[in-house]
A protein has these predicted regions:
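Short linear motifs embedded in intrinsically disordered, proline/glycine-rich low-complexity segments
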Residues: 1-137
């Protein structure tokens, strides 16, 4: 699979309010007898990004009459592009890797961010699964 299987966005109240975006699909999502006891599950990681709400981000209709304000959909695009890179190049990311983007990582904004650094998620860290280790980067 070249694309991610999905992405979840969580509201976090820890210290300053932020959105926590976590991918799924870079690791084995389902029990696979052929993957049991492998060192790493799938590529061995999932993307995890924490961002503060940005006033210019669009709102999202939750379908139940409620609206989630300022959804960071741009992060999903970044994660999808990184997933495509991994699947196409067969090169994966590990803790403390850096990848230049050669342009701002977020279009149509005045950001100075032109690369992605991979660090362990401070809350999720990593887990051992029946299919191998998964780090949240």
């Amino acid at each position: 699979m070249i694309n991610l299987a999905g992405v979840s966005i969580f509201d976090c109240e820890d210290s300053a309010f932020h959105r926590h975006i976590v991918s799924f699909g870079m690791s084995e999502l389902y029990y696979d007898p052929q993957s049991v006891q492998e060192e790493f599950s799938g590529w061995g990681f999932e993307f995890s990004m924490r961002v503060a709400p940005f006033a210019d981000d669009p709102d999202s209709d939750l379908g139940d009459g409620n609206v989630a304000p300022n959804e960071p959909f741009w992060v999903i695009s970044v994660m999808q592009n990184l997933a495509k890179y991994v699947h196409t190049s067969k090169k994966w990311f590990e803790v403390y890797h850096f990848m230049p983007a050669n342009s701002p990582i977020r279009l149509n904004t005045d950001t100075k961010l032109v690369g992605v650094a991979f660090a362990p998620d401070p809350v999720l860290g990593g887990i051992d699964t029946p299919n191998g280790r998964v780090e949240f980067l």
